[in-house]
Amino acid sequence: MTIKLHHLRPAPGSKSNKIRVGRGEGGKRGKTAGRGTKGTKARNTVRVGFEGGQMPLHMRLPKLKGFTNPFRTEYQVVNVGDIARLFPEGGAITVEDLVAKGAVRKNQLVKVLGDGELTVAVQVTVDKFTGSAKEKIAAAGGSATEL
């Protein structure tokens, strides 16, 4: 006989009914419901993060210092070496071309960094360049234009 989903049963003794506690003093677990008498554990659960009086972890760790500028502009970065690898023939390169090649995501600001070498002349038009990237593009006979 093949095993089917509706034939599966839990092993005997592996499942037991839940015990309903605190349902009257006549039953086995009435009144204090197996919690003993008085104390924090008898009344309710301890709060999240409570470590029995030990200084809790969130108070042992130092506070975060510093400042996060909410107006910071995030750029997606492309290195000069990546441009040389993706466009070996050179030519005019825009943000759309970089998106098409999978170098950056669309609808994001793009910045070209100066890591790597460039041998072909490229005319790059993106949002931002580093100084070293501009130098390398110009040295290869290309141009760097910021949007």
Swiss-Prot record:
Q: Is Nucleus among the key words of this record?
A: no
Q: Where do the segments described as Disordered lie?
A: 1-42
Q: Which residues form a coiled coil?
A: none
The record's section on InterPro entries has:
Ribosomal_uL15, Ribosomal_uL15/eL18, Ribosomal_uL15/eL18_sf, Ribosomal_uL15_bac-type, Ribosomal_uL15_CS
Instruction: Give the matching Gene3D superfamilies.
Output: 3.100.10.10
GO biological process, any: translation
- List, alphabetically, the SUPFAM superfamilies matched: Ribosomal proteins L15p and L18e
Ordered alphabetically, the record's keywords are:
Ribonucleoprotein, Ribosomal protein, RNA-binding, rRNA-binding
The entry lists its GO molecular-function terms as: rRNA binding; structural constituent of ribosome
Keyword Ribosomal protein in the entry? The reply is: yes
Q: One Pfam family this chain carries?
A: Ribosomal_L27A
Which GO cellular component terms are attached?
cytosolic large ribosomal subunit
State the family named in the UniProt similarity comment for this chain.
Belongs to the universal ribosomal protein uL15 family.
Q: State what this protein does.
A: Binds to the 23S rRNA.
Quaternary form? Part of the 50S ribosomal subunit.
Q: Which NCBIfam families match?
A: rplO_bact
* The protein, known as: Large ribosomal subunit protein uL15
The species this protein was found in: Rhodococcus erythropolis (strain PR4 / NBRC 100887)
Gene responsible for this protein = rplO
